[in-house]
């Protein structure tokens, strides 16, 4: 199945954030490496830049929003799970036009692609809790329907 430009952007953002979390490389350095990555030409570059730079810029605030939904400190999560949760939290708070279920489904797919064997289940559980806090009207409408 062909990946959408938005999915490709999220995958590249995950790779870039993984690199940033491990090396604390400068965003410009990560951008340069991503431009040479497989699939960059098919990505929604605006979305990629928005997510990657938004998460890096707001990392501390996003981590603070995620933490109450975790069963351990965020720095004890694998870098992949942390990157995926940061991306999804950024989208839940800033990409209001994207339905929360789409954001969660995309995050689960990213965790399946890049994470450990059961990491996607953890990501799904955390984001279900987080969506109720960050998108209360939307989640209530869906659950009440």
UniProtKB/Swiss-Prot annotation:
The UniProt entry, under Pfam families, shows:
NusB
Entry GO terms, CC:
cytosol
Its keywords, alphabetically, are: RNA-binding, Transcription, Transcription antitermination, Transcription regulation
Q: Name one GO molecular function term.
A: RNA binding
Q: Name one GO biological process term.
A: DNA-templated transcription termination
The family this protein is said to belong to: Belongs to the NusB family.
What is the role of this chain?
Involved in transcription antitermination. Required for transcription of ribosomal RNA (rRNA) genes. Binds specifically to the boxA antiterminator sequence of the ribosomal RNA (rrn) operons.
Q: Give the protein's recorded name.
A: Transcription antitermination protein NusB
């Amino acid at each position: 199945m062909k990946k959408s430009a938005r999915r490709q952007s999220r995958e590249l953002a995950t790779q870039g954030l993984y690199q940033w979390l491990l090396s604390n490389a400068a965003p410009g350095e990560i951008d340069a490496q991503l431009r040479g990555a497989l699939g960059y030409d098919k990505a929604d570059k605006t979305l990629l830049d928005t997510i990657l730079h938004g998460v890096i810029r707001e990392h501390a605030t996003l981590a603070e929003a995620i933490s109450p939904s975790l069963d351990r400190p965020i720095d004890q999560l694998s870098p992949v799970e942390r990157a995926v949760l940061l991306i999804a939290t950024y989208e839940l708070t800033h990409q209001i036009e994207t339905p929360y279920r789409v954001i969660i489904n995309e995050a689960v797919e990213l965790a399946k692609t890049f994470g450990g064997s059961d990491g996607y289940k953890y990501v799904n559980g955390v984001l279900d809790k987080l969506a109720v806090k960050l998108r209360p009207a939307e989640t209530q409408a869906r659950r009440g329907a």
